[in-house]
Amino acid sequence: MKFDRVTGKCVDLSFEGKGVVKLSYGTVFVDGLFPGEEAEIEIQYKRAGSYFGKVFRLITKSKDRIQPKCGVCTACGGCQLQQLSYPAQLEYKTKKVADAFRRHKIENIRVLPCISAEKPYEYRNKIQVPIGRDPHGHIVSGFYRSGTHKIIPIDKCWIEDPRAGKIILELKNLMKQFHYAPYDEDTRSGLVRHVLIRTSAHYDEVMVTLVTNKDEFKGKNNFVKEWIKRCPNIKSLIQNINTRDTNVILGERERTLFGPSFIKDSILGVDFLISSKSFFQVNPEQVEKLYRKAIDFADLNEDENIFDAYCGIGTISLCTSKYVKKVTGVEIVKEAIVDARKNANINNITNAEFLLGDAGEVFEKLVSDGEKYSTVFVDPPRKGLDQKFIDTLLRLEPNKVVYVSCDPETLARDIKLLSEKYEIKAIQPVDMFPMTFHVETVACLRLKE
């Protein structure tokens, strides 16, 4: 069956933004094929009873197909929807969230239209790029071809902050000047493995993390001085040392080569210190819309205490603090709690406390000690809420739960479990990741009367 060619019509887009083609012997998922389009498809492989293929020849085009800005988006795989018009992307994401709830047998709900981005390009404040050589031996940067470790050379990524491109260009120039070789996975030789760049939307600050295969390297001080001279908006330069034979990008050890070990950015007027490994939402424009919607859904008042599970570096906690009497944030990652406390201090916020531990255990202990929380915010990782925390919510019955999710499937799964005692008041997708199949969602639940 592999490399066979078949003709079929796309009837839908999958959860991962692939075209869905129904044939007599099964379903074929096709990259870059959109609803209503007919194509000759080359089958690539079969997995778990489904076929996966690519467009060999497009027979009919959708009215929503557009010319992409990026010439390699079909090979890179990072922008699965860049050939789809932006209004059609928003419709897909709204439907994607609604479909997730239907799959979990949650009926009679209305998913609000996905909130659009004013800047669907050049929005990402974080980018990580491998450094390597092309077949001619030239130093290149870019992204791995989908499903491989072969670098597609890219000088401009259309969804990254444009400040990153200049910094990467100068890195490659300086590598030639200082005779620094890119890392070679086969021989495990060479110096530079990756470069990670974080940019601040509200301050002209950039953090660069250079991932190297060696601890020390010749000419390091002069290399750093020259890079900063050419790119003066670099406010923090970190060396991450990764000498392991691994696909994991970052090593355990880091040192600061220039500036502080953080940069500063802002959400809804609250400043945050961001270190190299901090989790911080990648779209600064859209995260403000997301948090405003979450705060609106919560309908907070100045007399209530709220609980923020999975609080990270305190973004939701600190953005909500001015609306309530007290906010308690809990996170299981020690470094994040340290950062959250620093962020409260630099903003002179005194009604936010941050506790290290399991969210369910801490919540239960605080309530047993007499604390009362009318609203709980949750913003878990992609895997969703822990069952233990869901059980705690059902047992302790806070009046409102505001759920921020990066995965509609786990959101719908968790809300199905919570529907034993909670009813859905609102579901709002937000397009945090234009040009990709990903979508962020905020849902508001209230305790049933």
What are these model-derived regions, one by one?
Residues 19-24, 142-145, 209-211, 340:
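Short, acidic/hydrophobic/Gly-rich beta-strand patch recurrent on exposed beta strands
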Residues 197, 203-213, 271-275:
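Short, aliphatic-rich beta-strand segments
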Residues 43-45, 131, 199:
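Conserved "cap/hinge" positions at secondary-structure junctions
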Residues 2-6, 15, 215, 219-449:
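Rossmann-like S-adenosyl-L-methionine
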Residues 112-120, 185-186, 193-194, 198, ...:
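Short, solvent-exposed loop/turn elements at beta->coil junctions and helix N-caps
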Residues 56-68, 75-182, 202, 217:
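Extended interfacial segments that mediate partner engagement and assembly in macromolecular machines
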Residues 1-68, 72, 353, 361:
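Terminal RNA-binding accessory module
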